[in-house]
């Protein structure tokens, strides 16, 4: 690979980072590929390289998001909760959480071979929940919790603890929250 091509790659990654920083909503790999006039696979590789340099980019079901320090601090309260339900109740679970003004940051399971597996979800509204569910259904992807008979963890974030308490109460009333 020539020095010029490496520079082009670095310039492209700089531009990707700029687009992500400027965007008010997630950008898909396809959207970024079209803007950069490259394949989606090139974008996936570029994002991986940026993440390897500790650039705070997360992949969500809606696309890539740049998480700057201000955005990360905007949600002050954070809590990990344990849940149990079948895949048919995932939409209900997520809606109960977001209806209280809480964002579901991720889902985590403890796999018997691989250990902890975590996937970013980043849903904070019913619209985002709907998009997430549609994406799962349209791709025939399995929920991580299906690997653990429905047991899973979520990291929740909100402007305050009270909202997370309200979401937990709603989940408990629905029989989804695992309490100790």
UniProtKB/Swiss-Prot annotation:
InterPro entries: 3H_dom_sf, 3H_domain, HTH_11, NadR, WH-like_DNA-bd_sf, WH_DNA-bd_sf. Keywords: DNA-binding, Repressor, Transcription, Transcription regulation. GO terms for molecular function: DNA binding; small molecule binding. Gene3D superfamilies: 3H domain, Winged helix-like DNA-binding domain superfamily/Winged helix DNA-binding domain. It holds the Pfam family 3H. Disruption phenotype: No visible phenotype when grown in the absence of nicotinic acid. In the presence of nicotinic acid represses transcription of the nadBCA and nifS-nadR operons. Also binds to DNA upstream of the niaP gene, probably regulating it as well. May bind nicotinic acid. Homodimer. This is Transcription repressor NadR. It comes from Bacillus subtilis (strain 168).
